[in-house]
């Protein structure tokens, strides 16, 4: 049985959500039903596997199967995971699909209730899910929809051995949470922090095995999950990391608990209560302290002191209880529950950096005790439902009050690193995103604790506290990344020409690409010579250029650059350097299944790639690091598969992904083009070229067909014209038939590639559709027909159609 890939499972879940959208439900409503159904199916499938193992062991020992099933298979004491009672098992739910004696929604509710009743870990976790809920005298989810969901989730088994990598189900659950957050707007922001922001924060904290991580406003639990993921990918034991969270919303708490369970972290300690009023993690009556504290608290909220426990947490001051200025109260709580030598990272709105009043006094005390290590300005509109600018505070506690803060690394004491990253992001349709290259630059700058012009600067506390700055932490005050004004040459605007000064300003870019700018410009003969101009680029006394005579159209610029000898030489040097780097370091991937230290290999790739290509000065070190960071993120599911199934498992996954994309009817969700897959490009390049050429011909034929139809009416057409009326559609039909044949070709060729990968001496016979074959009716035949017809002199749409039919 092919293993489930993350992309396939995501499409499967997306289709399930589509079915509930047909009921008129929004994301805030239907998410609970998808979560509940997914959890039921997962628990049942895992239980079945464990039950088979328990019963099978007893049968091997000589026990009658029926007795083994009764005495051991139905005994909760023999199960390490969840015990699933009969009415919560998937086979029972399937059997009930045709039973009309009871509403099917009630069957599902009883299944959830029975599952929770038999497993203490699930106490109150599933209470909010009810398939019988009524709104405005109508069931929210109809019985038909409930049954469709069960049939839909019956398509795939969800045991660990069915997944390409063990954490696949947890990753799919994260996909669901993100999908719901995107649809829910501001409400989505309450439970979901973009994972690129979380990974940035976790990479700054660098949690290690044996430590404890706390998120006092944990939402769906993403910060805890990714902290665990970081430890695992660093080669550490993730089970030796204590995860604790607290959230003040019952629905978010349930989502978080399910997230932990589906990621295989049943021991995560997640509490339901208001963190500022009643912090729940305690030891011997005192607040528990943690090695790493990470959070994205709700922005700009009021709070109350009424019945507040442990008020000594706020020894740096009290923010106003009204006016939506409770942000620094969360920051103080995080410092109060952080161990000596620990670290804090928290997202904050920019207002906490510069507002006056009580917040300013808290800020002053933070500075006086040297608590802040770095302030990172983030791009706007990163967070769901919050368009206001945000930043990340990196802090270390100072319980002794000694100055400078002894918990900071020695070279960071008495100063703050300001990083202004608000201009570097990917602009999406509804919100902005941090790409891996942006995260890599921020983390690298923080780790090096270095100054970078217009991006980062270390500032002494004395400068910040001076009368001129008055404890104002506004990032732009210390790192202004405003772009320089665009130069405007009035004379060039009026009389034409390209100022030589503007060309000179881009000289470093031209040189990096190996391009000689004089090939694109020529001396402007009608321009007077300013006295100060002198000789520049062989054009004496001329302050303006014209474009070269060969550049008569903007479309000519690209070929001029691409065909420039210097550019071609630089491109070849880049290719050679890349090939040399890959040849020297690709073998590191082969060692991954042994040591499992993904982060170490990633770091080695980043450093070695930059070292190999930076001498070419085409890209700076941050751009080079971004290339590897982006590639690594895109390839991470394959790396996870490699760790657990080796290279054959990776190639199996590629084959299955290609086949799924061709065959899968769940196409509404996240998809990819199978013809763009790396494996298809490698083994079927000729065929892909022919497909592209045929598509070009189809587009041209459509245009000719439309012109033909506009000048000829069907009623007036003779028999000959009627025969060729739909010639373009005939060709499109042939293309569709070819693609249908290609389903098998994709699978056969990919499997042949897998065999060849395992046996270098194997000989592959090319598939007829891949070019060079003798199959009939394939792309070569169509392509030859097109070429033969188009080669005829005076080929009109009508004569071309006739010729095509003859061929």
Q: Model-flagged regions — what are they?
A:
Residues 1-205, 209, 271-280, 377-380, ...:
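Non-catalytic, mostly N-terminal accessory regions of nucleic-acid modification and defense proteins
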Residues 187-295, 300-309, 314-318, 328-329, ...:
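Conserved S-adenosyl-L-methionine
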Residues 290-291, 398-488:
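Polynucleotide-recognition surfaces of large bacterial nucleic-acid defense/processing enzymes
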Residues 338-344:
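Short glycine-dipeptide loop
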Residues 354-355, 382-386:
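Short glycine/serine/proline-enriched coil/turn segments at secondary-structure junctions
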Residues 388-392, 476:
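Short hydrophobic/aromatic beta-strand or adjacent loop that forms the aromatic wall/cage
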Residues 529, 533, 765-766:
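Low-complexity, intrinsically disordered segments with a bias for serine/threonine
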Residues 534-536, 771-776:
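Glycine-biased, low-complexity coil/linker segments
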């Amino acid at each position: 049985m092919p293993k489930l890939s993350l992309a396939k499972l995501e499409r499967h879940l997306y289709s399930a959500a589509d079915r509930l959208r047909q009921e008129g439900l929004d994301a805030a409503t239907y998410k609970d039903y998808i979560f509940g159904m997914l959890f039921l199916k997962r628990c049942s499938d895992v239980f079945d596997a464990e039950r088979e193992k328990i019963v099978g062991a007893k049968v091997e020992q000589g026990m009658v199967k029926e007795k083994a099933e009764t005495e051991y298979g139905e005994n909760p004491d023999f199960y390490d995971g969840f015990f699933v009672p009969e009415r919560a098992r998937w086979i029972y739910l399937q059997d009930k699909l045709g039973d009309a004696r009871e509403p099917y929604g009630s069957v599902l509710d009883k299944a959830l209730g029975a599952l929770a009743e038999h497993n203490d870990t699930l106490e109150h976790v599933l209470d909010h899910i009810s398939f019988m809920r009524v709104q405005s005298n109508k069931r929210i989810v109809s019985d038909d929809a409930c049954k469709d969901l069960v049939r839909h989730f019956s398509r795939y088994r969800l045991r660990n051995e069915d997944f390409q990598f063990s954490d696949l189900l947890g990753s799919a659950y994260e996909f669901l949470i993100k999908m719901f957050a995107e649809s829910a707007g501001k409400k989505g922001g309450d439970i979901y922090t973009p994972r690129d922001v979380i990974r940035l924060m976790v990479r700054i904290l660098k949690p290690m095995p044996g430590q404890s991580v706390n998120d006092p406003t944990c939402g769906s639990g993403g910060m805890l999950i990714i902290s665990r993921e970081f430890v695992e990918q660093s080669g550490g034991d993730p089970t030796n990391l204590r995860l604790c969270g607290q959230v003040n919303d019952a629905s978010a708490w349930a989502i978080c608990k399910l997230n932990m369970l589906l990621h295989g972290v049943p021991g995560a300690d997640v509490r339901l209560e208001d963190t500022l009023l009643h912090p729940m993690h305690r030891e011997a009556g005192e607040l528990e302290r943690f090695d790493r504290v990470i959070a994205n608290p709700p922005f700009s909220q009021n709070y109350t002191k009424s019945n507040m426990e442990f008020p000594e947490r706020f020894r740096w001051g009290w923010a106003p209880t009204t006016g939506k200025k409770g942000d620094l109260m969360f920051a103080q709580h995080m410092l109060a529950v952080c161990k000596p030598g620990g670290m804090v990272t928290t997202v904050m709105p920019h207002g906490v950096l510069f507002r006056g009043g009580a917040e300013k006094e808290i800020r002053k005390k933070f500075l006086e005790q040297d608590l802040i290590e770095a302030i990172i300005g983030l791009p706007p509109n990163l967070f769901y439902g919050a368009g206001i600018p945000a930043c990340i505070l990196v802090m270390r506690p100072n319980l002794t009050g000694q100055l400078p803060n002894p918990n900071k690394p020695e070279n960071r004491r008495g100063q703050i690193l300001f990083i202004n990253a608000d201009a570097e992001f990917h602009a999406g349709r509804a919100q902005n995103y941090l790409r891996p290259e942006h995260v890599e630059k921020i983390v690298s700058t923080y780790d090096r604790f270095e100054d970078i012009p217009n991006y980062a600067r270390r500032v002494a506390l004395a400068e910040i506290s001076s009368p001129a700055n008055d404890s104002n932490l506004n990032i732009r005050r210390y790192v202004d990344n405003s772009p320089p004004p665009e130069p405007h040459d009035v004379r060039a605007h009026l009389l034409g020409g390209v100022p030589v000064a503007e060309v000179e300003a881009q000289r470093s870019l031209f040189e990096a690409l190996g391009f000689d700018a004089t090939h694109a410009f020529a001396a402007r003969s009608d321009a007077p010579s300013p006295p100060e101009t002198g000789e520049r680029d062989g054009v004496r006394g001329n302050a303006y250029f014209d474009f070269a005579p060969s550049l008569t159209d903007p479309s000519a610029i690209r070929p001029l650059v691409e065909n420039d000898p210097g550019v071609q030489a630089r491109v070849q040097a880049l290719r050679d350097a890349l090939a040399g780097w890959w040849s020297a370091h690709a073998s590191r991937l082969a060692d991954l299944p042994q040591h499992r230290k993904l982060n170490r290999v990633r770091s080695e790739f980043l450093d070695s790639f930059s070292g190999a290509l930076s001498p070419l000065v085409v890209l700076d070190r941050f751009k080079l690091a971004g290339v590897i960071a982006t590639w690594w993120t895109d390839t991470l599911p394959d790396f996870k598969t490699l760790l657990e199934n080796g290279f054959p498992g990776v190639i199996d996954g590629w084959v299955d992904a290609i086949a799924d994309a061709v065959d899968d009817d769940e196409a509404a969700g996240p998809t990819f083009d199978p013809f763009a897959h790396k494996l298809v490009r490698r083994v079927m390049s000729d065929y892909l070229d022919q497909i592209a050429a045929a598509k070009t011909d189809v587009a041209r034929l459509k245009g000719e067909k439309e012109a033909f139809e506009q000048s000829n009416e069907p009623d007036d057409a003779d028999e000959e014209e009627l025969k060729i009326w739909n010639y373009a559609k005939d060709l499109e039909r042939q293309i569709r038939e070819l693609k249908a044949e290609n389903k098998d070709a994709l699978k056969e060729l990919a499997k042949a590639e897998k065999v060849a990968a395992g046996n270098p001496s194997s000989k592959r016979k090319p598939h007829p559709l891949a070019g060079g074959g003798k199959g009939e009716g394939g792309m070569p035949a169509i392509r030859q027909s097109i070429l033969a017809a188009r080669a005829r002199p005076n080929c009109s749409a009508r004569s071309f159609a006739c010729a095509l039919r003859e061929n």
